[in-house]
């Protein structure tokens, strides 16, 4: 009976200590992030909830940047440069 009372007391204490939302409260109602002291892997801090807590948002919720499309190869290939060097060496070596 004492053991059962001890278990119930421990469970009651744990419900007060462990947060139900997985480590943090929601940042803002329209933001899909949580206020935490450290962000998990795969998350980034968008802004500060309080002086010690960051609003951590998963990378999957962030917009992807629009990168410019590259046309063609802007850098000369290494094989082309080595061909030029080989031609120069052949012309200087031959008497």
Curated annotation (Swiss-Prot):
<dbReference type="GO" id="GO:0031640">
    <property type="term" value="P:killing of cells of another organism"/>
</dbReference>
<feature type="disulfide bond">
    <location>
        <begin position="27"/>
        <end position="55"/>
    </location>
</feature>
<dbReference type="GO" id="GO:0061827">
    <property type="term" value="C:sperm head"/>
</dbReference>
<keyword id="KW-0732">Signal</keyword>
<comment type="similarity">
    <text>Belongs to the beta-defensin family.</text>
</comment>
<dbReference type="Pfam" id="PF13841">
    <property type="entry name" value="Defensin_beta_2"/>
</dbReference>
<dbReference type="GO" id="GO:0045087">
    <property type="term" value="P:innate immune response"/>
</dbReference>
<feature type="signal peptide">
    <location>
        <begin position="1"/>
        <end position="22"/>
    </location>
</feature>
<keyword id="KW-0211">Defensin</keyword>
<dbReference type="GO" id="GO:0042742">
    <property type="term" value="P:defense response to bacterium"/>
</dbReference>
<keyword id="KW-0964">Secreted</keyword>
<dbReference type="GO" id="GO:0005615">
    <property type="term" value="C:extracellular space"/>
</dbReference>
<comment type="function">
    <text>Has antibacterial activity.</text>
</comment>
<keyword id="KW-0929">Antimicrobial</keyword>
<dbReference type="InterPro" id="IPR050544">
    <property type="entry name" value="Beta-defensin"/>
</dbReference>
<feature type="region of interest" description="Disordered">
    <location>
        <begin position="72"/>
        <end position="95"/>
    </location>
</feature>
<protein>
    <recommendedName>
        <fullName>Beta-defensin 132</fullName>
    </recommendedName>
</protein>
<feature type="disulfide bond">
    <location>
        <begin position="35"/>
        <end position="49"/>
    </location>
</feature>
<keyword id="KW-1015">Disulfide bond</keyword>
<keyword id="KW-0044">Antibiotic</keyword>
<feature type="disulfide bond">
    <location>
        <begin position="39"/>
        <end position="56"/>
    </location>
</feature>
<dbReference type="InterPro" id="IPR025933">
    <property type="entry name" value="Beta_defensin_dom"/>
</dbReference>
